[in-house]
Amino acid sequence: MAASAAVFSRLRSGLRLGSRGLCTRLATPPRRAPDQAAEIGSRGSTKAQGPQQQPGSEGPSYAKKVALWLAGLLGAGGTVSVVYIFGNNPVDENGAKIPDEFDNDPILVQQLRRTYKYFKDYRQMIIEPTSPCLLPDPLQEPYYQPPYTLVLELTGVLLHPEWSLATGWRFKKRPGIETLFQQLAPLYEIVIFTSETGMTAFPLIDSVDPHGFISYRLFRDATRYMDGHHVKDISCLNRDPARVVVVDCKKEAFRLQPYNGVALRPWDGNSDDRVLLDLSAFLKTIALNGVEDVRTVLEHYALEDDPLAAFKQRQSRLEQEEQQRLAELSKSNKQNLFLGSLTSRLWPRSKQP
């Protein structure tokens, strides 16, 4: 019995050791070669990191294609709508179609040609003046027509726009406007020719001219649009260019007739400004001297940065020269009078019987 018990205990301990070894082998993964392990790891990481793309979706390229298709459809629809709206015949007040020169063409050609003509005329309306004769004919007797025409810009010459948080946009009147109008109205036909729109400029002109010195008003639609500038074409004024003076703060405004213009510096709103008084004296001097062609005078000041300052310097120099001439003349007259009185004393005239 003792021997059998010893054998049984040995068998039981052997079974325990065998089961432990089997469990250890099952729990421990089999060893692999280093290259094979790295390859498996990289495959696993690639699968873990890569986007899980679902079937049927194409990513950003699909959205881009859809956007392009929608833009193309909208553009085509807009083009067809424009051709349909502007390509029809104009109608009269009764709703009847007005025939034009395109009626004999095919319908599609009619639509396209009318649309092209509409936009061409619209562009021409922006670029060209509204009329080749912007002003009516000069007044005839017994009415009075001033001998010269003065063309004035509004913004920068007569007014200065200012903006504040409390009041918004306001226009400040330049000092000397009343004096300018009063002194030049008998000599010049005053015309406001501004690059502002009529809706903006009309009430401003009413505020600066309550007494009605301004004869005519011309706005942006009367200018000629060239290279981004609104140019005032003197040849469209229906006046003699030899007697037209343009005052503006931009030389581009009278680029077609550079010797008809006086370019002033834009007014910055300074209340002590006296430019309009100097301008009045300058233009009054031209008119009172009866200059036949103002371009011969304005040509001398075309290259000056400040034409009015140059005029004042020349005027001051001429006054000094005139004073010297008068002083010399007065001195010579006094000498002649002295010699004449001495001669009469020496050789008295014989009395007539």
Curated annotation (Swiss-Prot):
Residues 87-353 are mitochondrial intermembrane. It is found in: Mitochondrion inner membrane. Residues 25-60 are annotated as: Disordered. The modification Phosphoserine is found at residues 45, 341. Keywords: Disease variant, Epilepsy, Intellectual disability, Membrane, Mitochondrion, Mitochondrion inner membrane, Nucleus, Phosphoprotein, Protein transport, RNA-binding, Transit peptide, Translocation, Transmembrane, Transmembrane helix, Transport. Residues 49-60 have a biased composition (Low complexity). GO terms for biological process: intracellular protein transport; mitochondrial membrane organization; protein dephosphorylation; protein import into mitochondrial matrix; release of cytochrome c from mitochondria. Residues 45-65 are mitochondrial matrix. Changing residue 149 to M: In MGCA9; uncertain significance. One of its GO terms (molecular function) is interleukin-2 receptor binding. One of its GO terms (cellular component) is mitochondrial inner membrane. The chain crosses the membrane at residues 66-86. Residues 143-286 form the FCP1 homology domain. InterPro entries: FCP1_dom, HAD-like_sf, HAD_sf, TIM50. It is a single-pass membrane protein. Residues 1-44 form a transit peptide. Widely expressed. Expressed at higher level in brain, kidney and liver (at protein level). Its main location: mitochondrion. Component of the TIM23 complex at least composed of TIMM23, TIMM17 (TIMM17A or TIMM17B) and TIMM50; within this complex, directly interacts with TIMM23. The complex interacts with the TIMM44 component of the PAM complex and with DNAJC15. The FCP1 homology domain does not contain the canonical D-x-D-x-[TV] active site, suggesting that it probably does not display phosphatase activity in vivo. It is linked to 3-methylglutaconic aciduria 9: An autosomal recessive disease characterized by early-onset seizures, severely delayed psychomotor development and intellectual disability. Patients have hypotonia or spasticity, and laboratory investigations show increased serum lactate and 3-methylglutaconic aciduria. Essential component of the TIM23 complex, a complex that mediates the translocation of transit peptide-containing proteins across the mitochondrial inner membrane. Has some phosphatase activity in vitro; however such activity may not be relevant in vivo. Belongs to the TIM50 family. This is Mitochondrial import inner membrane translocase subunit TIM50. It comes from Homo sapiens (Human).
